[in-house]
C-alpha cells in the first residue's frame, strides 16, 4: 500500500504540487491523469525518492520515503517519462548491466532475464542492439529494466506516449497483465491511453487533486446536464417559443434555421428524460422530426472541465 499525505513541492515561489493526499492499495492499477505541467512527473519523482518533497509524507506500508529511501527503491520498478536506454548495448547486455547494479548475478540473473523476457515479450529482440528496436519495443525494454528485480510496485511515467495505436494497445495489455500481481501507478495526459487499463483515475490540475475515483464514480459525481439537439421541419415560431411552458423539464438554449430546417437545442437534468414529451409536443404542432440526439457528459468532457493550463515547471 502507498499512502501520500499532504505532499507539496515548491520550486522557489512556484507551487508545483500543493498538499495532495491519496492512497493506493495492493493489486490496484491507478491512472494519474493531468495536462502537461500539472504536477504528475514531480509527484512521481518524489514517490520514487528522486526528488525531496517540500513537505508531506510518502509511506510504503511501514516505510517512509525520506528515512527508508533505499529500502523502498528496492521494492519499486520505475519507468521515467524519458526512458533511459543505452542505445549501443544489446537488450540482454542492458538488462544484465542493470541487474548487476542490483547485485542480481549468475543463476539469479538468468532466472530474472528469462522472466522479464517472457513477461515483456522481448524474445524476438533480446540479442538486438537497442538502437535497432522500435519505440514500442524500447518501452518494453524500459519496463523489463524496471522489473528485473521483481518489484512489488510499478510506477510508470507516461508509458505509452509517442507510440502508434498498435503499440499503445500492446503496452496497455502488458500493463494490465502486470497489474494482476503488482501495484501499478501510471501517469498520462491523454485519457484514452489509460481509460481501459486502470481500476481508478486520479486527476491532477495545477498541482492539486481535483478528482479521484472509478470511471463510474467520476461520471456520477461530475456529469452535468444533458444537451438535446433536435432538427425539425415545419415548426412555427410561436410553437417554438411556447415549448418551455408545455415541457417545463427542458430549458431552451438556441435556435438556428437553415433551408427550412430548424435546429433547436435544449438542456435538461441528467436524471430527467423529456424526449417523449417533446415528441408528443412536436406531433401536436405538426413538426416533422428529422433528428433528436442527446449528448451526455463523458469522461473526456469531465477531464476538460476539471483541467486548465498548468504551470510548466511541474
Region spans (language model):
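Short, charged/small-residue-rich alpha-helical element at the C-terminal edge
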Residues: 227-299, 306, 314
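Residues that scaffold the ATP/ADP-binding catalytic core of kinase and kinase-like folds
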Residues: 68, 146, 218-221, 302, ...
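ABC transporter nucleotide-binding domains
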Residues: 2-4, 9-205, 209-211
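ABC transporter nucleotide-binding domain
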Residues: 173-265
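Generic structural signal for isolated residues within well-ordered alpha-helices
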Residues: 71, 97, 115, 217, ...
Amino acid at each position: 500500500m502507498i499512502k501520500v499525505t499532504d505532499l507539496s513541492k515548491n520550486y522557489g515561489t512556484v507551487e508545483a504540487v500543493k498538499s495532495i493526499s491519496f492512497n493506493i492499495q495492493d493489486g490496484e492499477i491507478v491512472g494519474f491523469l493531468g495536462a502537461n505541467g500539472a504536477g504528475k512527473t514531480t509527484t512521481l519523482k518524489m514517490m520514487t525518492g528522486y526528488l525531496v518533497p517540500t513537505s508531506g509524507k510518502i509511506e510504503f506500508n511501514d516505510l517512509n520515503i525520506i528515512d527508508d529511501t533505499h529500502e523502498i527503491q528496492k521494492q519499486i520498478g520505475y519507468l521515467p517519462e524519458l526512458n533511459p536506454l543505452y542505445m549501443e548495448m544489446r537488450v540482454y547486455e542492458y538488462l544484465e548491466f542493470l541487474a548487476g547494479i542490483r547485485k542480481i548475478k549468475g543463476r539469479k540473473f538468468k532466472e530474472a532475464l528469462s522472466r522479464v523476457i517472457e513477461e515483456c515479450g522481448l524474445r524476438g529482440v533480446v540479442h538486438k542492439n537497442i538502437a535497432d528496436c522500435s519505440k514500442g519495443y524500447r518501452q518494453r525494454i524500459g519496463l523489463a529494466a524496471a522489473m528485473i528485480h521483481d518489484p512489488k510496485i510499478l510506477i510508470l511515467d507516461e508509458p505509452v506516449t509517442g507510440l502508434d495505436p498498435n503499440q499503445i494497445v500492446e503496452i496497455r495489455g502488458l500493463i494490465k497483465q502486470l497489474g494482476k500481481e503488482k501495484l501499478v501507478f501510471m501517469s498520462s495526459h491523454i485519457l484514452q491511453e489509460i481509460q481501459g487499463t486502470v481500476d481508478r483515475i486520479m486527476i491532477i490540475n495545477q498541482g492539486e487533486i481535483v478528482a479521484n475515483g472509478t470511471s463510474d464514480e467520476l461520471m456520477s459525481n461530475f456529469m452535468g446536464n444533458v444537451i438535446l439537439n433536435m432538427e425539425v421541419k415545419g415548426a412555427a415560431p410561436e410553437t417554438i417559443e411556447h415549448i418551455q411552458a408545455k415541457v417545463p423539464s427542458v430549458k431552451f438554449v438556441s435556435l438556428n434555421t437553415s433551408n427550412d430546417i430548424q435546429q433547436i437545442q435544449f438542456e435538461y437534468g441528467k436524471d430527467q428524460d423529456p424526449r417523449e414529451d417533446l415528441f408528443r409536443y412536436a406531433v401536436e404542432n405538426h413538426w416533422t422530426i428529422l433528428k433528436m440526439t442527446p449528448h451526455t457528459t463523458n469522461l473526456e468532457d469531465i477531464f476538460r472541465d476539471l483541467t486548465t493550463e498548468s504551470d510548466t515547471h511541474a
